[in-house]
Amino acid sequence: MLKNLDPLLSADVLHALASMGHGDEVVICDANFPADSVARATVLGKLLRLDGVDSARAIRAVLSVLPLDTFVDDPALRMEVVGEPNTIPAVQREAQAEVNAAEGRDVPFASIERFAFYERARKAYCVIATGEQRGYGCFVFKKGVLLAPDAPPQASAGNRS
């Protein structure tokens, strides 16, 4: 047993998240996503699972230990609804609330077309499948850095000189 870790995070998921470096990406996907075949093309090469939970709950667990990248404009991506790229379904609104809570600030999702999402997911470090049954519960997160207290302040994507 470990302290201060979300109990959803298995040893395999924790190892993958800890092994990721700055700029690596993790995919959190719904039960409709072709997770196994896509995961085989990733850096990790195998599928990770958080069965029995929805996407928002999985995001809460993952972002409890994974910082988002502040060096890029869009560290969080959502799969667009086919034919309706500006539609934000409930599953994505719930995920947005979890991202904002984890980061303590607004980090709006950028959207990505479905097939472009599949291609991006194949280049990710790993894929985590959830039990989310609603469509469009698929997201990509880019890992950031944690700096020591005495490190120089890092510029955010919108605040570079």
Model-identified regions with their sequence ranges:
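Long, hydrophobic N-terminal alpha-helical segment
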Residues: M1-D51
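Glycine-rich, aromatic-bearing surface loops/beta-hairpins
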Residues: G83-S161
